A protein has these predicted regions:
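Specific alpha-helical transmembrane segments that line the substrate/conduction pathway
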Residues: 59-70, 100, 108-141, 146, ...
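Hydrophobic transmembrane alpha-helices of multi-pass small-molecule transport proteins
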Residues: 5-6, 72, 94, 133, ...
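Juxtamembrane helix-loop-helix junctions in multi-pass membrane proteins
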Residues: 39-69, 115-118, 186-211, 224, ...
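Specific transmembrane alpha-helical segments of multi-pass solute transporters/efflux pumps
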Residues: 40, 44-45, 73-123, 131, ...
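Juxtamembrane helix-entry segments on the extracytoplasmic side of multipass membrane proteins
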Residues: 25-31, 54-62, 85-90, 162-183, ...
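Membrane-interface helix-cap regions at the ends of transmembrane helices
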Residues: 20-21, 50, 54, 68-86, ...
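Helix-helix packing/entry segments at the starts of transmembrane helices
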Residues: 61-63, 119-125, 190-213, 243-282
Length: 317
């Protein structure tokens, strides 16, 4: 069964909402999808840093959303519910569009004024936000294995980037990226809550044009004096962010979030900095350090504990 086929199609609304009671514990499909997203997300901070000298942060967010529309639309068209949203649920779309614009714009701004390595740490606080909110709002059960796995994976991230954190940076930029990570966590739980009413792919497709309008309005108001340049590196970086990150990652992650428990899925997000640092080590032919090995081991152990936490629970039909 593919992720597209796995998306629920019948419930209390014709747009295919997801019942919390039908959220599943992690399985091989969830882990494979999360690995894909984290691998592509791993290069996002570097891609943002590569282009911010040519394109202002808020404008960059708007452009990448424009590029992502065909990918998101194609994936949504392949789901059973396609683009349907009931009229009474359309009020959710602009709220999610605002969330999307604010989260990506703040990440871009913080990364442009800080360091990509530090951004990869502070943006990945979102699992620590999702876990308590998913218990409180979504009534998910988080077992001791999942909590231990969450702590292990987060410790692995700290080990991976300890040197970058100690090297210093712009505190204001760090705070902005930290807030972006918190926004992503809140947004994830709110999305999961809304999936009772609206299918994941439909919501993502319709919220994206709203985010585009907000970003272009924001760049007009706040970045009117910023320079816009066109370079080969900037074009490649923007295409990567639009197609791979906003297109593929956002679509796959939304479908995963609609099917699986938010807290367990969010913990897998700690793999993102591991992929980013490993990719940088490979590209630049850097030596494999003890911190990379230890960090990878802690993250891997954390992901394993999270994946097996609900294994004995009956999977809903």
């Amino acid at each position: 069964m593919t992720l597209l086929e796995a998306t629920p199609t019948k419930s209390t609304s014709e747009s295919g909402p997801v019942s919390f009671s039908k959220s599943r514990p992690l399985d091989a499909l969830a882990i494979a999808g999360a690995i894909l997203c984290c691998a592509l997300w791993g290069g996002n901070a570097v891609a943002v840093k590569a282009v911010v000298g040519d394109v202002p942060p808020i404008g960059l967010a708007g452009i990448r959303f424009c590029i992502s529309i065909p990918v998101i639309g194609w994936i949504a068209s392949r789901t059973p519910n396609k683009f349907k949203i009931q009229r009474k649920h359309w009020w959710l779309v602009p709220i999610h569009g605002l969330f999307l614009a604010a989260q990506v714009s703040t990440f871009n701004w913080g990364t442009s004024h800080g360091q990509a390595g530090r951004s990869s740490v502070f943006i990945n606080v979102h699992p620590l936000v999702v876990t308590p909110l998913s218990v409180w709002i979504l009534h998910e059960h988080v077992g001791w294995k999942a909590l231990t796995g969450l702590a292990s994976a987060f410790s692995g991230v700290i080990v991976l980037v300890a040197g970058r954190l100690m090297a210093g940076g712009d505190p204001k930029a760090d705070v902005i990226v930290f807030c972006s990570g918190c926004l992503f966590g809140i947004q994830s739980v709110f999305q999961k809550w809304c999936y009772r009413k609206v299918a994941p792919a439909s919501l993502l497709f319709w919220q994206t044009p709203i985010a585009i309008l907000i970003c272009f309005l924001g760049t007009t108001v706040f970045e009117s004096e910023a320079e816009w340049k066109v370079s080969q590196s900037a074009v490649l970086a923007i295409m990567y962010q639009g197609l791979a990150v906003s297109g593929v990652c956002f679509s796959v992650w939304s479908l995963l979030l609609g099917r699986y428990e938010a807290a367990s899925l969010a913990a897998l997000g700690f793999m993102t900095p591991l992929f980013g640092i490993s990719l940088g080590t490979w590209i630049h032919a850097e030596p494999v350090t003890s911190s990379l090995i230890l960090g990878a081991a802690l993250i891997g152990f954390g992901v394993y504990l999270t994946a097996i936490d609900k294994r004995k629970r009956k999977v809903p039909a």
